[in-house]
């Protein structure tokens, strides 16, 4: 069997192989979280964050247009005003804002952790086809 055929078979096998997602590690922030740029969007009480560009249900002045350097993307938790930690406006009409359910990083942790994706790799012997 030619090298090209082996490579093609291996690529086809890998493409059809299922992927497994490893365990997720909770995101964390340093200091007061002003530099936090993760994608967490849930408050300490479990409420969903309102998008920074939205005025519903809460009108506010912290928009991405007015504060372009504060990372006010989507509805992600941020700290654009030097509060004690990352926060957001909530989608609950009765609760204007809350701190986010994030923890401060310990000294040996990074700012954002991403879940690992594991792709099983078959042995090369399984990819060979005997040709008579």
From Swiss-Prot:
PANTHER family linked: LIPOPROTEIN(A), PLASMINOGEN-RELATED
Glycans attached where?
101
Keyword Secreted assigned: yes
List keywords of the entry alphabetically.
Disulfide bond, Glycoprotein, Kringle, Secreted, Signal
For the keyword Signal, the answer is yes
- Quote the tissue specificity entry: Expressed in liver but not in other tissues tested.
Q: Which residues form the signal peptide?
A: 1-21
Gene Ontology cellular-component terms listed:
extracellular region
Q: Main subcellular localization, coarse class? A: secreted
Which subcellular locations apply to this protein? Secreted
Q: Which InterPro entries match?
A: Kringle, Kringle-like, Kringle_CS, Kringle_sf, Serine_protease_kringle
Q: Which named protein is this?
A: Putative apolipoprotein(a)-like protein 2
Recorded domain comment: The signal sequence and the kringle domain are highly similar to the apolipoprotein(a) precursor protein. This protein is however much shorter and does not contain any peptidase region.
Look up the domain of life of the source.
Eukaryota
- A Pfam family of this chain: Kringle
What organism does this protein naturally occur in? Homo sapiens (Human)
Q: Where is the Kringle domain?
A: 27-105
Disulfide-bonded cysteine pairs: these are 28-105, 49-88, 77-100
